Amino acid sequence: SGDGTKAKYEPSIKKHFQTVLDMVTLDGYWMEMGVRGGRSVEWLLEKYPNKEYHGFDSWEGLPEDWFIGASVRYKAGDMNVDMPNFPNNIKLYKGWFTESLPKWKSDHKGPIAFIHIDSDLYSSCKTTLEELNDQIVPGTVLAFDEFINFRLTKKLGNWYEHEWKALMEWLQTHNRKIKPLTRNYAYQASCVVIE
């Protein structure tokens, strides 16, 4: 639970993302779920060129159809791109989250400081939160890319069926609490875990 009216407003997607990065205070892993072409990884590197960052993606496109509202519909396989190249401090993990996250967890213990969830789908967000639940601790910052339709457009009219829904279920299932941190003009928002 949390009061979204108290979130810091940042107008642009890039400025919003970089503002969220500056709010991370916890020591722990920094992660991105849904790297795709790596735009937000590049934004991270602008601010923190030496930060170790763990990025996950199938690089095969969406694992299932995604209906986000109005006539905007993506099919399984849409959004596939080649895996980008980054400096060695950016660790990339190829595969579906259901396979790559358990493998990653077996070698990476301890708290997660930051997760950028840009995996679009309810199922992908749910997998992320459930798989990483024991490493998401008070102080972990969660940033979402398609979270709420702040613009009230038809393009993301189905927002409540995806990242929002997965987060609400995770909060209830695990008796967690969050505090809003930021939002932008479109769909992005972030929060910090407090319980």
Residue spans of the language-model regions?
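Pre-Walker A adenine-sensing motif
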Residues: 18-20
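Conserved SAM-binding loop and adjacent beta-strand
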Residues: 2-16
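S-adenosylmethionine/decaboxylated-SAM
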Residues: 22-195
